[in-house]
Amino acid sequence: MSKTQEFRPLTLPPKLSLSDFNEFIQDIIRIVGSENVEVISSKDQIVDGSYMKPTHTHDPHHVMDQDYFLASAIVAPRNVADVQSIVGLANKFSFPLWPISIGRNSGYGGAAPRVSGSVVLDMGKNMNRVLEVNVEGAYCVVEPGVTYHDLHNYLEANNLRDKLWLDVPDLGGGSVLGNAVERGVGYTPYGDHWMMHSGMEVVLANGELLRTGMGALPDPKRPETMGLKPEDQPWSKIAHLFPYGFGPYIDGLFSQSNMGIVTKIGIWLMPNPRGYQSYLITLPKDGDLKQAVDIIRPLRLGMALQNVPTIRHILLDAAVLGDKRSYSSRTEPLSDEELDKIAKQLNLGRWNFYGALYGPEPIRRVLWETIKDAFSAIPGVKFYFPEDTPENSVLRVRDKTMQGIPTYDELKWIDWLPNGAHLFFSPIAKVSGEDAMMQYAVTKKRCQEAGLDFIGTFTVGMREMHHIVCIVFNKKDLIQKRKVQWLMRTLIDDCAANGWGEYRTHLAFMDQIMETYNWNNSSFLRFNEVLKNAVDPNGIIAPGKSGVWPSQYSHVTWKL
């Protein structure tokens, strides 16, 4: 890539000329090297790719036009100093940056920027080190490019797996750092990934480096006197043991936000529990969801249910095991009779509860007796351990996931339809049978009105449930894509009307969801806007992320 070459990206950021872009990119090349810069100048570069080979140009699961959210270039900093230099240049040009870790972010927009023409800042390509694993404190420190699979392999390669487990989401290829700051979940007792972080290092919009919590306390050896750069200085001994530090707790400002660029994070790991047993409880009837959730609530609050368990709809499990055509020749949403037939064929229930027991055998035995006794109140329930199920069963997959072993089997449900793509609709529900049934009824009805099957799961936290509706669609069917847009927008309004809000969403729906958080004349959004404009006066970091826009961007013009 020549320094004198003129680049012509397919799209430019707002208010920036082609000459501005070229001056900016040439300066970037001088910082990171041409091998770490890719300008998107040809439609041949807009390839959807796959989960294992993710694209960084756009959203591969595009519900809008494929190039609706499109980067002008992809830039991969090599280190913290590069990030700081890039931020400085971006301020000079008011050039929008869209930081990513790995860029998978499946179902929520991938690596695509909210503002087309932004530079996607690929934090994970070069910054991919496991910086520390501390056995005594049971934590690790990682850079953005470390995936769950990378961290698992690191533990195994260093003979640490018998001492420490990590917590993994459904798919093992995501960034440990990225998933935590997006407040993703896993399925061990450490399943709330944001809760399990302690200490972050962040490049602010002015280029300054910040460490949060106890990380703001310098090492008493004063390493800066030894000539170390701030990013290379050792952390306080307790930075990754106590997350809050002193004074205002600011970590949340860098979660699902556009207030800074996270370069390092401390994550708690789970000490090997010295015993483990996964299980499946099948619920035969659709209406059993209500009673099951009411049984789950006291068990989860009392911690008899130790991990983050899931209540999965039959079609989520069925879709892991085969596409829709393998079960039915119909293109319409499947009927209750067909769902019953599939459940019988797969020896599953209409709902299927996956959980795990942790600890020595006497502890597991008492917990299992408690759980089994409680669920036995539901007529027709059945109980399974992995060895009771076929080799390809979902329980065999969840058996790995719930002990922190990364897998990729859950990718298969995206192929439920031809040219499969997906979005997640992710409202929060009370751990209440009545609320679960209401939310299920609303989402299922709207899915069917859009001509789609309901595919979903309830992920049970301590006092709430993430209801993850997996909206699978044919991305080459323009009519179906328009229906999916209608479906998402209608579900957002439906849920807001019932007092339910979403915890995370796709790029295209961030504005609408933020507008539902409108108590007291949207004081929450207005406060975030004040902070955004104060810490990022040029609006360079991820404008529009989570519906928070800097003052340079008109809400009327940019809102979707």
From Swiss-Prot:
Residues 67-272 form the FAD-binding PCMH-type domain. Optimum pH is about 10. The modification Tele-8alpha-FAD histidine is found at residue 422. Optimum temperature is 38 degrees Celsius. Its cofactor is FAD. Competitively inhibited by cinnamyl and coniferyl alcohols and by isoeugenol. It catalyses: 4-hydroxy-3-methoxy-benzenemethanol + O2 = vanillin + H2O2. The record marks 170 as: Important for the catalytic mechanism. The active site is at 108, 503, 504. GO terms for biological process: lactate catabolic process; methanol metabolic process. It holds the Pfam family FAD-oxidase_C. It is an enzyme of class 1 (oxidoreductase). It is found in: Peroxisome; Cytoplasm. Keywords: Cytoplasm, FAD, Flavoprotein, Methanol utilization, Oxidoreductase, Peroxisome. Catalyzes the conversion of vanillin alcohol to vanillin, and also the conversion of a wide range of phenolic compounds bearing side chains of variable size at the para position of the aromatic ring. Crucial for the degradation of the secondary metabolites derived from the degradation of the lignin. Catalyzes besides the oxidation of 4-hydroxybenzyl alcohols, the oxidative deamination of 4-hydroxybenzylamines, the oxidative demethylation of 4-(methoxy-methyl)phenols and the oxidative hydration of 4-allylphenols. Most active with 4-allylphenols. Homooctamer (tetramer of tightly interacting dimers). To bacterial flavocytochrome p-cresol methyl hydroxylase. This is Vanillyl-alcohol oxidase. It comes from Penicillium simplicissimum.
